[in-house]
Amino acid sequence: MDLLSDIEKQLQKATAQGFLIALSGGLDSTVLLSLFAKLCQKQPHLPPLSVRAIHIHHGLSPNADSWAKHCQNLCDQFQIPLIIERVQVDKTNGIEAGAREARYQAIKKHLQIQEMLVTAHHLNDQTETFFLALKRGSGLQGLSAMQQQSVLFGMPIFRPLLGFTRPQLEDYAQQEKLNWVTDESNEDNRYDRNFLRNEILPKLRERWAHFDLAVQRSAQHCFEQQQLINDLLSEIFTEHCQIKNQFKLLQFRQYSLAKQTALLRMWLAKNQLEMPSKRQLTQLINDVIFAKEEANPQFQLVNKVIRRYQDSLYLTKPFSDLTKCTLKLEQNMLNLPDDLGNLTVHENEHNLIFYWQDYSVTLEKTNLPISIRFGYSGKVKHHPKRPREDIKKIWQELSVPPWERNRIPLIFYGNELKSAVGFFRVFDEY
């Protein structure tokens, strides 16, 4: 099969207006860059192509600088614009996972609207991905491995080389006299993917010549079965998930465990989260969904937190504890912590008007020091005709989830609470 003509056919079906090539400088991505450069030269026979490349400098290898320089030379040769992005790798969950997370987050910054990320994954990579999913005990979703087009980390991804083997890419590279770099870490069999690539899969291919194609068929069967399950559950799923980061639990407890886990996996997939293990899903169901009514349960899943409130699950990021945070308001704008944005103040003859996000509150002027705090316990008078009430009850009446209550800016005049911006103000007792 001819690489160039095959990719040309694939591009005719692509809806993107631009393509951002993930370029490591290795064999696979160098072949990919060369193919797209050729397609750009054939533009009179194609819709105009907008092609850029991006190289992620992880800083993990002593050769990282030379790899970046090599990629720049390649792109100069092919007249394709290149972005070089340096990243810091968080090794908490392992170098592989940290590098992958850093890489995709960096790429996401540069990916433009109507542009697809193009990666050089090929058939041999597909087999490795399938085996890694098998090792983790993955279900249909994980065993579906990689698709030619998908969404990952919220980005559209195009993998035009999935139907080709590594030897086919090597043949093309030699014919085109391409130069590429070699990552020395690829020989380190302490990494699972390298162990499979260097030790296990060569023996399987030696025994069964078409082993990779058979794995690809199995992965496709898994994908089709998962799609069928999603189709059969789509109407029920829509009833539970009308807002992307919220999952309603009404009737959920009446379903079988298999149906519950399938619906939860659909919700997590909709939010582009990696699939949890069966043990994690069972823990989520038992410890969060079936927790006591008055509980405030939560479940950490990678860099997200699943919380329950009023018979719904909510997906949020992890939040910092702000209850001990006190900020003095000395200017007309205050930068709030933990990505809460800015609080601004405008004044007229008698009043101060506080703005935060889409909310505002008007308070009388004061000579007392003004501060912003988060979290409060006690009774307040939030309505002129009602007695003082416990603030917890007020939050409940306003249907504010517990984790949001300590993230709403509270305005204090001296040590007296005056307002929760956008939710209530405190009235004096006469």
Curated annotation (Swiss-Prot):
The keyword Transit peptide belongs to this UniProt entry's keyword annotation: no
The Gene Ontology biological process annotation of the record reads: tRNA modification
Residues that hold ATP according to the record: 24-29
> Which is one Gene Ontology cellular component term of this protein?
cytoplasm
Q: What is its EC number?
A: 6.3.4.19
Tell me the domain of life.
Answer: Bacteria
Provide the GO MF annotations for this entry.
ATP binding; tRNA(Ile)-lysidine synthase activity
Localization, UniProt: Cytoplasm
Catalytic activity, reaction form:
cytidine(34) in tRNA(Ile2) + L-lysine + ATP = lysidine(34) in tRNA(Ile2) + AMP + diphosphate + H(+)
Which keywords fit this entry according to its UniProt record?
Answer: ATP-binding, Cytoplasm, Ligase, Nucleotide-binding, tRNA processing
> What is this protein for, i.e. what is its function?
Ligates lysine onto the cytidine present at position 34 of the AUA codon-specific tRNA(Ile) that contains the anticodon CAU, in an ATP-dependent manner. Cytidine is converted to lysidine, thus changing the amino acid specificity of the tRNA from methionine to isoleucine.
**Entry domain remark:** The N-terminal region contains the highly conserved SGGXDS motif, predicted to be a P-loop motif involved in ATP binding.
The similarity annotation says: Belongs to the tRNA(Ile)-lysidine synthase family.
| UniProt protein name | tRNA(Ile)-lysidine synthase
- What is the primary gene name for this protein? tilS
